[in-house]
Amino acid sequence: DRSGLVAEYAGQTATKTNKLCDAAVGGVLFIDEAYSLIDDSGDDPYGREAIQCLLKRMEDDRENLAVILAGYSLEMEKMIRTNPGLHSRISSTIEFDDYLPADLGLIFENMCEQNQYQLPATARYRALLGFDELYRLRDRYFGNGRLVRNAFEDSVRRLADRVANVSRLTESLLTSLTEEDIAIPGLSDQQLDNLIQQPHELRIQCRGCERSVRL
């Protein structure tokens, strides 16, 4: 992001940007929220210096350095339009679709598994309904994987709060996320409770099966 390329004082940005490019030669330089390099006011000499330095390195090291600029679509388009040099040096543009609710649920399950937390069916169902609702209400700033990470971290904190006063702790208590632990950023517990009370149609696809079943 911007902090990795732009320095605090005049004359230091080029050095900082070049150092980052040097470290990435032979590989990939990934810059997230790349549009933050350009101030909306247009009066940002440090950001312009970073971009000019980056453009030069993209040209000079084009055989040994791949640069990926990432961010929200509209902001990225605006950034590219305001700098002809960027437009001419970007060889391809890829726009990723938002994760589907099932994908978000699977990411959540994988995070639980990787961190050795158990996720019972009731807790999994509550999380999936929450992701489905937020997907339905999503705008262009939809969090995708970041949303899931925040949900996982919030749920783990709830688990810790729930067992804080338990006198006899077991491994199962410390590592089992229950339905009441599930927290989905942007939805209250009452909203999640209401979702659970509503009828839902789910499509079940088992691994290795050729058919799916609707419930």
Residue ranges and their predicted role:
Residues K78-R81, F96-Y141, A160-S167:
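Conserved C-terminal "switch" segment of AAA+ ATPases
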Residues S73, T122-L128, G145-R146, F152-E153, ...:
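Conserved C-terminal helix/linker of AAA+ ATPases
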Residues D1-A24:
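Short glycine-rich substrate-engagement loop in P-loop NTPases that contacts/grips substrate
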Residues D1-R2, A24-Y46:
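Conserved P-loop NTPase "ATPase switch" module shared by AAA+ and STAND
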Residues I204-C209:
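Short cysteine-rich clusters marking metal-coordination/redox-active sites
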Residues P199-L202:
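Short metal-coordination and nucleic-acid-contact micro-motifs, chiefly zinc-binding Cys/His arrays
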Residues Y35-G42, I51-D97, Q114-N115:
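Canonical AAA+ ATPase core
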Residues V213:
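Cys/His-rich microdomains that often coordinate metals
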